[in-house]
Amino acid sequence: MTERENNVYKAKLAEQAERYDEMVEAMKKVASMDVELTVEERNLLSVAYKNVIGARRASWRIITSIEQKEENKGAEEKLEMIKTYRGQVEKELRDICSDILNVLEKHLIPCATSGESKVFYYKMKGDYHRYLAEFATGSDRKDAAENSLIAYKAASDIAMNDLPPTHPIRLGLALNFSVFYYEILNSPDRACRLAKAAFDDAIAELDTLSEESYKDSTLIMQLLRDNLTLWTSDMQAEEVDPNAGDGEPKEQIQDVEDQDVS
């Protein structure tokens, strides 16, 4: 086996063993060869990072939720411990995001030649800046949000020209970009417009849906519709009562990283 094949096989082994940190290392070696990745290699890289970041994002949400409960009780000593612990998780999140963003910037985006791979990588860039914006504050949050917006817009411009509306990567981009508008920019109107346009465009061209991407595309369309339903009901509730939902746990908004699709 060549070095490239060797690392791809290592990544597959690590995935089966659920050792995602090692999967990341193997696929980073492939990415650093400065070649255009195959669809399989690209998906392995995405799955590896999705799992290492996903575990920390879930931890951060749980810790933040506990922190809010303890704040309501006024438990100062516990709050100090929680803040320190949250800081550790945030450092891990920052390190993972800066790692993949570096790989994208130095190797993957410069070597991408097809429209599909460019959309895939710019979407990834938008996603990982969005993950930074989820927990950052002040100017760090502003910078992460701006970088995310620029990357998502670059991906969207290419997707509109090069990919059909039913393509799972174009649909996944629309899903995550709309979540960015809703959660990071607090712009439910734009989030709903983007999600609805992507869903409607895909419905109008359902006959172009290829057999191999049918499952992924229809799953993402369902997620777009689920988010639209959730967002419109939230917006209607706020119109009736501006304080609706304050202090209540919110239903989880779905993005494509929460699902088993790439």
Swiss-Prot record:
Q: What is this protein called?
A: 14-3-3 protein epsilon
Q: Name one GO molecular function term.
A: molecular sequestering activity
Q: Is Phosphoprotein a UniProt keyword of this protein? A: yes
> What organism does the record attribute this protein to?
Drosophila melanogaster
Specify the effect of Y214F.
Suppressor of sev-Ras1 V12
In the record, Phosphoserine modifications are located at S262
Gene Ontology BP, a term: negative regulation of neuron projection arborization
Keyword Phosphoprotein applies:
yes
Q: What function does the entry list? A: Positively regulates Ras-mediated pathways. Acts downstream or parallel to Raf, but upstream of nuclear factors in Ras signaling. Three mutants have been isolated, that suppress the rough eye phenotype caused by mutated Ras1 (sev-Ras1 v12). Inhibits yki activity by restricting its nuclear localization. Together with pav, has a role in the inhibition of microtubule sliding during neurite outgrowth.
SMART domains, per the entry: 14_3_3
Q: What is the effect of changing E183K?
A: Suppressor of sev-Ras1 V12; subviable
